[in-house]
């Protein structure tokens, strides 16, 4: 007989907690800023490394925490955890408002959301008054990523699930051909042919952030609710127009949304700020529970019963409503001793509405799968599986960031659950086998984001790489397919473009390096690599490209299905810092294609043999960022140096003079130093244009300066 969970899991509670832990709060003011999702933040713990403990402090010096993190990663290069994932998101959001000494200037988040709301309403207003202006911009790609044919096989490579990170999606219950999915980069994509092709829904509408939840009306696929940017957005016309539903004084970021199938005007949302409900199609919202909620479920066949997974005092808790979500009470039968580490999820199935599953990410990187059974009017809970075991190998992965759970709507014994790897059970959770990710037979991108099992036997899975479909719950390979054609939302950390050939390369967040070309379209190639802001086109030779995380350079194939034509020595790369927001560049001499310049470390380097060897021309006191060369006089260079700002050379880089006016009032400020983007007139070496990179939070956003005297 299976023992109840409170007898199966031994929780040791120390009577004396560390002074550090007692002094910490889960969230700081940083966690309230746009681009940071509080639900992904793991629980405060003594076991966290030093840099991770700093995430619970305020204020924090960016330089100090970055150094600590970088040292840690050198010692643990392959580690994945909720803390690492949260830090990367936290750092990316805060770097634009970091001063040279590492001080983080708190931006005005309220003004940001006010401006965002204004822009959202303006898009709708302009569309309604036919004031949307046309443009010559078209989508270049990646339109559909394919595997690189490294072996030269006669069989063309297949589509590759390494394209865009899809946080969430929903399949229309009234028409399974219609699906809406949302990306980490804030795009909503729509398909009407079951993912064979995707189109943007709301191309001109700024959703304001990653799309964390989507819910489609149960009988009308044109009515859709999307959670993104601390807002709930609604469309009534299939994604042509969108409306923000929350006022600036009542914003929240929903991680899960459910529409009542009996009363579709009722929408329930679980968020880091609690449980919210709307009874009028999203026009008005009220908070029904104040503690963070990770998931919400409406009991199949009884819409009066609503369940939400939440936490209290560092432990998981299940709350239940018997009046359709108007009021909630703590469910007494749910175990109250499971330590909450990084969130959890619930799952129910219409084939047996008296059963519920909960996956709880607990201490020591260990998830627990619980099973609830309704007997009479009481729910009883038992431990179904313990992670990091032979029968259930799953760990906590990256926490709530990549966590899924679902039960088949036609067979309660089929369960899919995952974090970085997806696992499947066909015996009700007694044993699990890996499906795909870091283990398993299916080539699914690691880091599972969302899942939906349908009554027709189809299962959709979204990952950091895109959308995946199986028609037999991952039974055989022939019934599995990648569905990323036209899926928009790749996060291009790196970018470079050819001159003589229309080649574009770049490193992508989550999805490695890609190569695109006019002679590959509509295909893009997966080149490999991880998450580097890299990618450089060598202009003088056909199809020669280089990526810092792939070793030597590549000679790309002549056509998308072809074999790469070889490798070549390329021994030095520009400074490239994570997220692509601060990187140097590769500069070509305008007259000699084999002569290259770049900034690596504090050095200004020159190669006369197309990157095989390099000579140090000058050593600056700090890192070299953006570079430019004058086409009209190739002896003239401009460089942006960390802590120094704009510098100029008139002798080919042998000597440099600081040009302080740009980074001094009344123009820019000292904060601009090391953050410049600049270009030089092709006809006049003394005419340059400059702006601030990543100036979203700055009062200098949108400012472009021109100098006509060098």
Give the location of each predicted region.
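Bacterial Sec-dependent N-terminal signal peptides
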Residues: 1-30
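Beta-propeller blade termini and top-face loops
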Residues: 29-710
């Amino acid at each position: 007989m299976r023992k109840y969970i409170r007898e199966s899991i031994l929780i040791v509670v120390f009577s004396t907690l560390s002074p550090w832990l007692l002094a910490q709060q889960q969230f700081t003011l940083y966690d309230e800023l746009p681009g940071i999702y509080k639900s992904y933040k793991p629980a405060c713990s003594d076991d966290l490394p030093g840099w991770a403990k700093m995430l619970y402090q305020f204020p924090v010096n960016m330089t100090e925490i970055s150094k600590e993190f970088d040292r840690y990663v050198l010692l643990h290069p392959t580690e994945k955890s909720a803390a690492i994932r949260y830090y990367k998101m936290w750092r990316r959001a805060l770097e634009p408002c970091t001063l040279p000494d590492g001080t983080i200037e708190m931006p005005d988040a309220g003004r940001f959301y006010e401006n965002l709301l204004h822009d959202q309403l303006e898009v709708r207003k302009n569309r309604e008054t036919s004031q949307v202006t046309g443009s010559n911009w078209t989508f270049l790609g990646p339109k559909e990523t394919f595997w690189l044919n490294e072996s030269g096989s006669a069989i063309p490579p297949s589509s590759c699930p390494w394209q865009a990170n899809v946080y969430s999606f929903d399949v229309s219950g009234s028409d399974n051909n219609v699906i809406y999915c949302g990306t980490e980069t804030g795009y909503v994509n729509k398909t009407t042919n079951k993912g064979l092709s995707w189109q943007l829904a709301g191309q001109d509408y700024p959703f304001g952030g990653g799309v964390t939840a989507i819910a489609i009306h149960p009988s009308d696929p044109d009515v859709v609710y999307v959670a993104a940017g601390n807002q709930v957005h609604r469309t009534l016309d299939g994604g042509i127009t969108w409306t923000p539903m929350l006022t600036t004084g009542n914003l929240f970021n929903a991680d899960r949304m459910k529409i009542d199938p009996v009363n579709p005007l009722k929408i329930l949302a679980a968020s880091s700020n609690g449980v919210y409900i709307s009874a009028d199609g999203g026009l008005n919202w009220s908070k029904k529970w104040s503690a963070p909620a990770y998931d919400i479920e409406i009991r199949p066949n009884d819409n009066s019963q609503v369940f939400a997974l939440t936490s209290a005092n560092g432990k998981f808790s299940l709350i239940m409503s018997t009046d359709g979500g108007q009021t909630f009470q703590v469910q007494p039968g749910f175990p109250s001793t499971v330590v909450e580490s990084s969130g959890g999820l619930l799952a129910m199935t219409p084939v047996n509405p008296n059963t519920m599953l909960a996956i709880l990410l607990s201490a020591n990187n260990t998830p627990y799968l619980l099973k609830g059974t309704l007997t009479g009017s009481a729910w009883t809970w038992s431990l179904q599986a313990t992670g990091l075991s032979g029968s259930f190998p799953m760990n906590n992965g990256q926490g709530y960031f990549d966590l899924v759970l679902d039960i088949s709507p036609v067979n309660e014994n089929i369960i899919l659950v995952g974090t970085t790897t997806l696992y499947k059970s066909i015996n009700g959770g007694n044993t699990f086998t890996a499906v795909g990710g870091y283990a398993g037979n299916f080539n699914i991108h690691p880091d599972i984001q969302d899942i939906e099992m349908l009554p027709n036997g189809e299962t959709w899975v979204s990952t950091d790489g895109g959308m995946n479909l199986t028609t037999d719950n991952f039974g055989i390979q022939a019934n599995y397919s990648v569905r990323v054609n036209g899926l928009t939302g790749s996060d291009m950390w790196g970018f470079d473009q050819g001159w003589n050939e229309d080649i574009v390369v770049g490193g992508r967040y989550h999805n490695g390096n890609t190569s695109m070309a006019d002679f590959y379209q509509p295909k893009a190639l997966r080149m490999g690599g991880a998450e580097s802001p890299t990618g450089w086109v060598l202009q003088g030779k056909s199809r020669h490209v280089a990526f810092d995380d792939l070793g030597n350079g590549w000679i790309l194939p002549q056509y998308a299905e072809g074999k790469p034509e070889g490798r070549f020595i390329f021994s030095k790369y520009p400074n490239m810092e994570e997220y692509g927001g601060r990187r140097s560049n590769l500069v070509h001499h305008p007259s000699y294609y084999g002569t290259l310049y770049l900034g690596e470390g504090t050095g200004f380097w020159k190669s006369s043999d197309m990157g095989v060897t390099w000579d140090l021309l000058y050593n600056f006191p700090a890192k070299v960022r953006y570079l430019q060369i004058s086409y009209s006089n190739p002896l003239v260079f401009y460089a942006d140096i960390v802590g120094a700002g704009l510098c100029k050379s008139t002798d080919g880089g042998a000597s440099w003079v600081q040009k302080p006016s740009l980074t001094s009032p009344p123009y820019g400020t000292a904060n601009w130093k090391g953050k410049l983007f600049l270009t030089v007139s092709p006809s006049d070496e003394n005419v340059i244009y400059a702006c601030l990179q990543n100036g979203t939070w700055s009062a200098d956003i949108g400012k472009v300066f021109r100098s006509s005297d060098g």
